[in-house]
């Protein structure tokens, strides 16, 4: 079974959502509202697991969730 793994940054994002009582769908809507870019669950999942590099989206997520200087690295996955 091929199990996808979140990057450290992706795990930080998921944890920040849980702490705020917000869903990934809420985050997708906020990203779209702030950037004007369409966001869906599949694309955000690829970003959180390091399969996609989207600097504008990462910046928006960091701002929305108030994540401080947490780097987004494709190779930094959680087992």
Q: Model-derived features: where do they sit?
A:
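A short, Lys/Arg-rich alpha-helix, primarily the initiator
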Residues: 1-22
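Pre-recognition alpha-helix immediately N-terminal to the DNA-recognition helix
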Residues: 11-12, 43, 60
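Residues in the recognition helix of alpha-helical DNA-binding motifs
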Residues: 16, 30, 47
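DNA-recognition alpha helix
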Residues: 25-36
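Recognition helix of helix-turn-helix/homeodomain-like DNA-binding domains
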Residues: 34-53
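DNA major-groove recognition helix of helix-turn-helix/homeodomain DNA-binding modules
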Residues: 52-72
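Short amphipathic recognition helices of helix-turn-helix/homeodomain-type DNA-binding modules
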Residues: 71-79
């Amino acid at each position: 079974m091929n199990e996808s793994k979140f990057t450290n940054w992706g795990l930080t994002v998921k944890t920040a959502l849980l702490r705020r009582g917000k869903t990934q769908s809420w985050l997708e809507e906020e990203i779209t509202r702030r950037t004007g870019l369409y966001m869906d669950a599949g694309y955000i999942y690829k970003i959180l697991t390091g399969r996609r590099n989207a600097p504008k989206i990462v910046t928006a997520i960091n701002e929305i969730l108030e994540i401080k200087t947490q780097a987004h690295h494709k190779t930094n996955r959680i087992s």
